A protein has these predicted regions:
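Terminal (often C-terminal
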Residues: 4-102, 107-112, 117-125
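Extended, compositionally biased low-complexity polar/Lys-Gly-rich tracts
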Residues: 6-9, 135-137, 142-144
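Intrinsically disordered, low-complexity regions of eukaryotic proteins
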Residues: 65-67, 141, 148-151
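Surface-exposed coil/turn segments at beta-strand junctions on protein surfaces, enriched
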Residues: 78-82, 129-131, 141-143
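Extracellular beta-strand-rich recognition modules
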Residues: 83-93, 134-136, 146-152
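Short, surface-exposed coil-to-beta transition loops
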Residues: 99-100, 132-136
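Short, surface-exposed linear segments at secondary-structure transitions and domain or protein termini
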Residues: 124-134
Length: 152
């Protein structure tokens, strides 16, 4: 996907023709109606109590900006277009009567639970008799080249 398009200006007194108006508006409108976005997911991750586990995302529902690969670095969502992003991450844990369930979203961690920077950590008490759901949505200023990974 191309970077956020620059807007075109018109000079005072310049005649606005259909072709100039289309050239000035089509690319920005196309960008706004199809922004960069990605929905990658995973199923059946095995976790060890007390250990942060990198979550590998083995499937995609959509990816409009080549932000995820199921073959290389499948745990990463890589930003290719700088801008504001609405980032949601979610996990469902099986029923259990003890402890807490944790999700940690990290920036540029390189696959390490202690690498890079923590953007969000969520701790939720386990629910006995029902699944425990952990979710968070954040608005982030993202820079092209950065990557995000989730640990559970």
């Amino acid at each position: 996907m191309a970077p956020v398009p620059a807007t075109q200006t018109f000079l005072a007194g310049e005649k606005v023709t259909a072709s100039k108006l289309i050239a000035a508006t089509k690319t920005p409108i196309d960008f706004l109606t199809n922004p960069p976005r990605c929905n990658a997911n995973s199923s059946g991750v095995s976790l060890t109590s007390g250990t942060s586990t990198l979550v590998t995302l083995d499937a995609e529902a959509w990816d409009t900006d080549n932000m995820h690969s199921t073959a290389a670095n499948a745990s990463r969502i890589t930003i290719n277009t700088t801008g504001q992003y609405l980032v949601s991450f979610y996990a469902r844990f099986p029923s259990n009567s003890t402890g807490y369930r944790q999700l940690n979203l990290r920036l540029n961690s390189g696959g390490s639970a202690t690498g890079g920077s923590t953007w969000s950590t969520i701790n939720v008490a386990a629910v006995n008799g029902s699944s425990t759901f952990v979710t968070r949505t954040l608005e982030l200023s993202c820079v092209a080249g950065d990557h995000y990974e989730m640990f559970a």
